[in-house]
Structure formats: C-alpha cells, structure tokens
Regions:
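Helix-loop-helix
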Residues: 1-38, 92, 197, 211-230, ...
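Soluble non-transmembrane domains of integral membrane proteins
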Residues: 80-339
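Short linear motifs in intrinsically disordered/low-complexity regions
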Residues: 3-4, 39, 44, 51-55, ...
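Short non-domain terminal segments
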Residues: 54-57, 66, 129, 184, ...
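Juxtamembrane extramembrane loops of integral membrane proteins
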Residues: 9, 24-121
Length: 551
C-alpha cells in the first residue's frame, strides 16, 4: 500500500512535469534570429519585406488551388481612418480599404499599465500584422483589390451610446462603369466584423470574380521567461478544414505552401489568449492557402466565383474576427473556431470544466469564488470514493501499533513481514490500495483544470481577493503555494505513515517539493488544490473520529 501511495504522489508530480514539458515543446517559439544594431532580426538568407513584396491571391483554377500573382496597384499608402467601438480601436487605410491596426479596449498588456492595450494588427515593418482584402476578377477585368484606392466620407467613426451597430462604407469605381461599395459592420460587444461588397456592373460585359481575405504577419518570437506564460504559448497560423484543426509550422510553410478547399473551414493567426481569423461564407467551398517568405507568413481565403451580368448587381460576404478567444463569441462566429482555445489532449475534460466554471462565475461574479465552488462540486462528485478510501486509511492508521509489532518480530525478513501484513489487512477487512484512488482520479482533473486556467482568456488578469489580482499567473508573493504545502503536511499527519523509514522521509519531503513546484503554477490552480486539501482534511478528520469510535 505504502509503495503504491508513494508511487502515485510521485506520478502526479511527474505527470505535471511532463505536461509542463509538453507545453514548452508544443507552444515554445523557435529561437529568434540574430538582431541587427537597431534590434531588427537579420539573416542574409531571408529577404526583407518591402512594398514590392506584395501578392494577390489568384482565383481558384482547380480544386484546392489559389495561386499568388503580383499586385498592380498605384503603390500609394492612402490615408488612415479611425474606427472606435466599445471593444475595438482600429485604423483603416483607404488604400485597399483594409484594417491595419487593432487595439483591444479593456485588455491591457499589464494590469499596472491600463493605458497600454493589447495590439493585434500593426502596420509597422518590425511587427507587420495586417489584413488585405478585396475582390479578384477573371480575365483581367477591373477589380477593387487591396491595392485599389477607396473613397470614404469621414475621417473617424465611433459607435455612439445607445447604438448597437456601426457600418463603415467605402466606395470605388472603375473608368468603364464597374462600381463597388465595401462595407464593414461592427456590433456592440462583439469582435466579429462583417465584411460585405456590393457590386454594380454598368459595363458592357459580364463581370466574374470572387472575394478574398488575406493576413500577413511577421513571426516575432518572444524571449522565454519563467514569469511570462505568454512567452511559452504557441504563436502562429492555424487552419480548420471543416472537420479538424491544425497548427501550421512556419518551416513547413517555407518548404511547401498550404493549399486546400474546404466547406465550413477558416484560417487564423493565434497567440496566447488572442487571435485574428478569416472566415468565408458557410455552406460554400472556399480555397484556404498559406505560405511564407523569410519570417513573414501570408494566409489567404478565396471565396466562390460569382457572375455579375452587365447591368446587374452582386453581393459578396465574409467575416473577420479580431480579439480575445472568448469561447461564446468564437462558437457564434464559426464552427470549430472555439478549438483555437487549445486545451490539449484533455479537451474532453477541460471543456465541461470550463462550462461549469463559467456558470459558477455567472452566479458569483468572481472567478476565484467560481474555482472554490467548482472544487466543492468535484469533491461532492467523488465524495463516496473519498469516503471509502478515507475509511481504509483511518483503519490502517489504527493498525499502526500492530504493524510496528510485526516489524519488530520479523526484523529483516521482508517477505515474511509482507505476508503477515497482508493477512492482517485481510483479517481487518482493509484494502491498502483504496487510499490511492482519490489521487489517481484527480490527476486528469488537475491537469485539465491547469489548461483551463492557462488558456481561457476569461480568466486573464482576473482578480480574486486580497493579494491575488491575476488567477492565470503565479502568486506574486508565493503565499498560496506555502499554504497549500502546509495543508499537504497536515493531510499526511492524518494518514498512516509508511513503515519504511526511507519512504517516510520521501513522503515528508513531498509537501516541500510540491510547494516549490506549485510556486510557478497559475494562482487559480493552486487555489483549487489548496481548497481541495482543506476539504480532504475535514473529511479525513471526521472519518478518523468515526473509525476511532468503532463506527
């Protein structure tokens, strides 16, 4: 029994360590290239991205193909137009009519700098991260692509108080009579952005074309830091083909570009807690492509080709998502988009845990109290199992004097001692393995909750009480890990000590080991384990009293 219990405690630490290692391998960024004097990455084998490095996605010529062709725009930069909603602060450029800057209102980079917001889109060369959208035409016809110059009425647009929807319209016209309106639709509280084109063909010939979405981003690895979980998270492109979700490796894109046709799919760029996604209309096949040049990758979505006869009108619709990975909004935006919240191999447990946590948060208004209530619920679910285990442990605790007598009688005869102890357990109807079950059962729950707290943006910078002002980061003063270590020590005192002196010393050291280990875990996870220990102590103390009275 004692070997099994010791093994399971060590296994818990080992599994947690493996999870940490897997996280680093899965999400760890590639080492950054050497920097130049001005701090920008430099590699003679990697061409710099300049205005000439500009591509347009081609119309699909065969299933899964959307070739890239050189743009033929005027090369101007256009002017910037500001758009502000209750959740987004954006810049749009009239050249291409594209979104090139996005600051997330209410999401500061650090809690102590509320004025410094998380920025997802950025036109600066060192942090290039921009959308490029437009229409492609067949047969060399006029087209309002992302190099076209669009006209717009205002210099700034704001979602007013009491206004639920904001539309921003741009206009374009060709000399031969083709006109287009490009309309962005923003909704209060939403990071989903509608994009609609209204085409009027007053030319003498039919017009044929498709809408496209493109995202260009420079891969900028973060320097790893033990205190910065963002630096270990996966940053890069992902794709969903309507059935499965896949992370795209930058090196693979350099060697072989992605080309696929999917119905109900999407393509996106993610980082810890945030993403930008390009979503074609559902129900129709779209071309999804990805490629890279140097440290810049380009993702594209090309929708189905449509005909607009002479004298007729046509409409093209797409969707962009720019913001935090709020699961409710992700599910509403596109099927499978919630998979960008990566809970790893324990998703089947993590998703129900988050669902319960979310409901409890709705009741309490505080994620810390939601974690405490979740811990109580988990304890209630496994109460009978813990009770059976606790009774077995209490009976074994009462058998300690008799076990000590057996040790003195058999001395170094380990085989004889083992047989005598098994006979004693059998006679007293004690199951020595029962004490291991709660630890074994809690392992997957523990790891699943770890990923929930780490990956769920809902808990990013979420305060609890007193000194805990961010449940997704470590305790800044290490008070909670110390309290957790104390409760582990008390738990051990309530359970029977291992008969082997070496095992006893190892068990006594485990609270110290776990305290150090948990010091770098999210405070919310340590809170869960601390509360779980308190409940286990109360339950075991009650069981010990009952067993001692002969119950």
């Amino acid at each position: 029994m004692d070997n099994q219990r010791l093994f399971l405690w060590i296994a818990l630490a080992f599994v947690a360590f493996l999870s940490w290692q897997a996280w680093q391998i899965d999400y760890g960024p590639t080492p950054p290239p050497a920097a130049t004097a001005d701090g920008t990455p430099a590699d003679p084998a990697i061409p710099a991205v300049d205005s000439a490095d500009d591509e347009l996605p081609g119309l699909p010529s065969a299933p899964g193909e959307a070739a890239l062709t050189p743009a033929s725009g005027d090369g101007g930069d256009g002017r910037y137009v500001r758009i502000v909603t209750d959740v987004l602060d954006l810049d749009l450029t009239t050249r291409g009519g594209d979104l090139v800057r996005a600051d997330l209102i209410g999401y500061p980079v650090r809690k102590d700098r509320p004025d410094q917001l998380v920025r997802l889109l950025d036109p600066s060369p060192n942090n290039l991260y921009v959308f490029r959208t437009g229409l492609r035409a067949a047969g060399g016809a006029a087209e309002p692509n992302h190099q076209a110059e669009w006209a717009i009425a205002e210099q700034e647009y704001r979602l007013a108080d009491g206004q639920d929807t904001l539309e921003v319209a741009l206009e374009w016209a060709s000399p031969d009579g083709l006109t287009a309106r490009k309309i962005y639709t923003f909704r209060r509280g939403s990071y989903e952005i509608g994009l609609r084109y209204e085409i009027r063909n007053d030319t003498a010939a039919a017009w044929q074309g498709a809408s496209y979405l493109q995202l260009r981003r420079r891969h900028v690895p973060l320097d790893r830091s033990m205190t910065d979980v963002d630096s270990y998270s996966y940053r890069g492109p992902i794709v969903y083909n309507g059935d499965s979700y896949e992370k795209l490796d930058l090196d693979d894109l350099l060697e072989e570009p992605l080309r696929m046709t999917a119905t109900g799919g999407w393509i996106a760029s993610i980082q810890h807690h945030f993403l930008t996604a390009m979503i074609p209309p559902g129900g129709e096949a779209a071309s999804l492509t990805g490629g890279a040049r140097g440290d810049v990758y380009t993702l594209s979505v090309v929708g189905p080709v449509r005909d607009v006869p002479a004298g007729a009108t046509g409409t093209f619709e797409d969707t962009l998502f720019v913001g935090p990975k709020i699961q409710e909004q992700l599910r509403a935006a596109a099927p499978g988009l919630e998979l960008s919240v990566d809970y790893g191999f324990l998703t089947i447990i993590s998703q129900p845990l988050f669902w319960v946590l979310d409901k409890l948060h709705g009741l309490t208004g505080n994620w810390g109290w939601a974690i405490i209530l979740l811990t109580v619920l988990i304890k209630l679910v496994f109460y009978k199992l813990s009770e059976t285990s606790g009774k077995s442990m209490a009976k074994m605790r009462n058998l300690q004097p008799r076990i000590k007598q057996l040790q003195e009688r058999f001395g170094d005869d380990r085989q004889g001692l083992s047989q005598a102890m098994m006979q004693l357990y059998k006679r007293e109807k004690v199951n020595p393995a029962a004490g291991c079950l709660p630890i074994l059962v809690q392992m997957p729950v523990f790891l699943a909750l770890y990923w929930v707290l780490l990956e769920s943006v809902e808990m990013r910078q979420a305060p609890f009480a007193l000194w805990i002002n961010d449940l997704s980061s470590k305790d800044p003063y290490f008070i909670l890990p110390l309290l957790m270590g104390v409760t582990m020590f008390i738990q051990q005192k309530l359970n029977p000590a291992p008969p082997d002196p070496i095992q006893a010393k190892v068990m006594m050291a485990l609270p110290i080991v776990f305290t150090v280990f948990f010091a770098f875990f999210p405070a919310g996870l340590v809170l869960y384990w601390f509360v779980n220990n308190l409940l286990s102590i109360a339950q075991q103390w009650k069981i010990n009293r009952v067993v001692e009275r002969g119950g």
